[in-house]
């Protein structure tokens, strides 16, 4: 018996070695050759694990310090704003260009260029159309009001006739009663009293028949004028325009025709000369009065003046000719001479104790007297600033439980260094939005936003003079990309985000430029707007570049984006199709575990896409021997009963982890997805075969069974996502077996499993808190209830097929 036991132990040991050789640690690359095995040993060595963090930190600090502190490599000791330690004389005659002052002058010239204007034909046609509509409305009102004057002006003047037809019904009735019956006017208004005297004079010189005709004409005119007032009330026109139209009704026909033609001519003349935007009302009024001087009688003049002021108020037909303005500005810049600073031999450049000015610095630097050298203090300050930024970044990474690998450190270092480099070359072409979009897609929004703030600050420190419009524009666009990119699930959504990034970058640039250059706000739009559009297009271009380079970075640095995870979770992927075909029971088990884990991940705000994808691939290793797992036996004989050896059986079970890793590497699955294969089992005890072996050893009087041989080799879950999948995988079989149980029974079983995993220290490195376990348990039971919902039983008669017509029966 002891010999049999020794042989069994040897076989098991050999199988274990075979398994271990194909099951390296999850953070390493697959290896088959002896050289690769040596590399893996070095990679996993304690020395490398201890030395890597400080070495990588040092490389990152040196790289960023070298870029951010570039201006300290050759920095003048005698610069603008410093005191000269001694009096310095010009060694010879010299003249040097002041580049800084020259560039400032060029900016002033560009900003101060008076814009070229051009007449906009569309706006001109639109204003003429508005004029036609305005005059047509007056003509329609005059038509409704009828002929004016409606009585001979020798009898009543135009003003008196307009007053008579505009009387209200009550006032006219009082006046008519007085004229016809001699009834006195009660409390007559001044205008009624005036009309009373007028009719007294007419009655004295006019026959009753003529007076009756006059009254009839007045009533007709009042009726027609009432329609006019009703029309004006219906359209609810602007009160000022209404008054102008009523004023036009007071003119007789010939006078109105002359007034109308004058309005058209003056309006055309002003539009031909050009009407600029922003002209004030007093200035517009003076222009109109100048054109109308001594042309019309007083009342018609007032109608024309008011009409023109209303037609032209807040209107314009002159727009900026952007191309001509830009060319004019560039010509002015080219015509401008460089600002030069000159000095004669032995003349004093700066005296001892005097603060050096820009002009003096140009001379010192031109003569080579500015004492340029490496500013070690500046470099040390830069290194301290970079080190502090890295500490903050690492602290945030640990805070959100986002462990980073060596290749992650390298990628983040390269991305972070690229931005200050581009800022130094030209702030216009900085790639802050691109690195934010990539970091957010690979590592989440928190790290992306942290990186944007820190790298943006370092880039600002790297520049000798901060160009705020470029820095703030790119930073705002980068923050937008960092917040949103990790939530997008398709290339189309990322492309739309790129448009938003470009628009944000251009808009923030424009407003920052306006704030910084507020002194030239009247003409700044014409020079800043084209630059803002170009800068916005650059933001779009960086986003497109980030989207395009993302798949290559995913492969090169073994990182994933949400889009990549969605693609991997597609059931049409070759590996998932193989799993569904070769191990259908395992595939169904995987789907149920995915439902459990995904729901829990969503509840705990974990990476749902990663959990879904990792769960779908966590048991692919079972394809190496599908019948070795009960879910694939479909009610057939149990393979392990035929083997009847717990050591062989446990090696078959454990091998699904090592073989799964081999398959995952062969199909190019990312590391974060491969991590689910070993970590979902952790170092759990395969208790069924352990107890079987233990009982067999006790019956045979053999030495105690080594428990480690019946445990998975691990590692235990290293993230919240793999920890959730471990719990879901452990509970799946137990919940599936509960068909008629109530939720309380299911909850009790889930809690027992959770406590067993917690006490076995399987979750200690996962980041899951003990207080979160009841939340996960509640989610699991809720999903179980959804799967095992009750359905009504169909009556037997409903299942019987009744043939009504042979011709309609199909088999």
UniProtKB/Swiss-Prot annotation:
Keyword Transmembrane: yes
One Pfam family matching this protein: 7TMR-HDED
Subcellular location(s) per record: Cell membrane
Superkingdom per UniProt: Bacteria
GO cellular component assignments: plasma membrane
HD domain: residues covered: 586-734
Protein name per the record: Uncharacterized protein slr0104
């Amino acid at each position: 018996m002891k010999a049999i036991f020794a042989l069994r132990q040897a076989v098991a040991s050999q199988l274990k070695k075979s398994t271990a050789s194909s099951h390296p640690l999850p953070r390493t690359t697959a290896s088959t050759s002896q050289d690769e095995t040596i590399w893996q040993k070095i990679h996993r060595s304690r020395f490398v694990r201890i030395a890597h963090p400080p070495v990588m930190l040092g490389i990152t600090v040196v790289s960023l310090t070298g870029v951010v502190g570039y201006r300290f490599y050759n920095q003048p000791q005698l610069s603008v704003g410093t005191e000269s330690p001694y009096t310095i004389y010009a060694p010879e005659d010299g003249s040097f260009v002041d580049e800084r002052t020259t560039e400032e002058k060029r900016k002033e010239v560009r900003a101060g260029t008076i814009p070229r204007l051009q007449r906009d034909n569309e706006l001109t046609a639109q204003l003429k159309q508005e004029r036609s509509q305005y005059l047509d409305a007056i003509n329609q009102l005059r038509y409704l009001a009828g002929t004016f004057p409606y009585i001979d002006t020798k009898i009543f003047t135009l003003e008196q006739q307009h007053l008579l037809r505009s009387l209200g019904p009550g006032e006219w009735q009082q006046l008519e009663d007085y004229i016809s019956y001699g009834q006195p006017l009660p409390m007559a208004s001044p205008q009624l009293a005036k009309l009373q005297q007028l009719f007294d004079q007419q009655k004295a010189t006019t026959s009753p028949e003529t007076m009756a005709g006059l009254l009839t004409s007045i009533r007709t005119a009042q009726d027609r004028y009432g329609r006019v007032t009703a029309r004006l009330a219906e359209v609810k026109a602007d009160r000022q325009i209404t008054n102008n139209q009523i004023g036009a009704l007071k003119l007789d026909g010939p006078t109105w025709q002359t007034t109308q033609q004058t309005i058209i001519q003056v309006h055309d003349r002003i539009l031909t000369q050009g009407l600029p935007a922003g002209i004030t009302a007093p200035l517009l009024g003076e222009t109109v009065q100048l054109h109308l001087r001594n042309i019309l009688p007083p009342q018609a003049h007032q109608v024309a003046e008011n009409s023109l002021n209303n037609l032209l108020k807040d209107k314009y037909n002159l727009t900026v000719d952007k191309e001509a303005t830009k060319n004019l500005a560039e010509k002015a810049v080219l015509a401008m001479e460089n600002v030069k600073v000159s000095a004669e031999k032995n003349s004093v450049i700066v005296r001892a104790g005097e603060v050096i000015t820009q002009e003096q610095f140009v001379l010192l630097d031109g003569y080579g007297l500015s004492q340029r050298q490496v500013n070690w203090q500046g470099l040390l300050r830069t290194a301290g600033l970079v080190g502090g930024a890295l500490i903050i970044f690492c602290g945030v990474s640990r805070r959100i439980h986002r462990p980073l690998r060596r290749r992650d450190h390298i990628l983040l270092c390269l991305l972070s260094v690229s931005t200050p480099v581009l800022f130094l070359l030209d702030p216009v072409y900085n790639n802050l939005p691109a690195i934010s979009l990539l970091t957010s897609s690979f590592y989440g929004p928190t790290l992306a936003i942290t990186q944007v703030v820190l790298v943006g600050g370092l880039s600002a420190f790297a520049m000798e003079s901060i160009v705020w419009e470029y820095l703030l524009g790119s930073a705002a666009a980068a923050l937008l990309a960092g917040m949103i990119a990790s939530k997008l699930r398709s290339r189309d959504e990322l492309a739309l985000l790129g448009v938003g990034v470009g628009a944000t970058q251009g808009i923030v640039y424009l407003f920052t430029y306006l704030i910084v250059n507020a002194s030239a706000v009247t003409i700044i739009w014409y020079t800043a707007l084209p630059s803002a559009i170009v800068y916005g297009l650059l933001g779009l271009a960086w986003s497109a570049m980030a989207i395009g380079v993302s798949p290559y970075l995913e492969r090169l640095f073994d990182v994933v984006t949400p889009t990549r995870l969605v693609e991997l979770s597609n059931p049409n992927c070759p590996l998932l199709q193989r799993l569904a075909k070769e191990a259908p029971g395992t595939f169904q088990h995987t789907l149920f575990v995915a439902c459990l884990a995904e729901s829990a991940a969503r509840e705990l705000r974990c990476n749902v896409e990663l959990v879904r994808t990792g769960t779908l691939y966590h048991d692919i290793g079972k394809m190496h021997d599908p019948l070795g797992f009960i879910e694939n036996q479909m009610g057939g004989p149990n393979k392990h009963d035929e083997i009847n050896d717990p050591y062989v059986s446990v090696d078959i079970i454990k091998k699904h982890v090592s073989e799964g890793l081999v398959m995952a590497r062969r199909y190019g699955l990312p590391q974060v997805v491969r991590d689910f294969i070993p970590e979902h089992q952790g170092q759990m005890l395969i208790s069924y075969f352990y107890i079987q072996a233990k009982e067999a050893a006790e019956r045979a009087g053999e030495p105690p069974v080594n428990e480690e041989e019946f445990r998975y080799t691990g590692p235990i879950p290293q993230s919240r996502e793999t920890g959730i999948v471990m719990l879901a995988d452990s509970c799946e079989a137990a919940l599936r077996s509960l068909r008629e149980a109530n939720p309380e029974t299911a909850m009790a079983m889930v809690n027992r499993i959770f406590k067993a995993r917690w006490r076995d220290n399987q979750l200690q490195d996962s980041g899951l808190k003990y207080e979160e376990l009841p939340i996960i348990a509640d989610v699991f039971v809720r999903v179980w209830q959804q799967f095992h919902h009750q359905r009504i039983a169909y009556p037997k008669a409903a299942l019987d097929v009744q043939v009504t017509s042979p011709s309609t029966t199909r088999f």
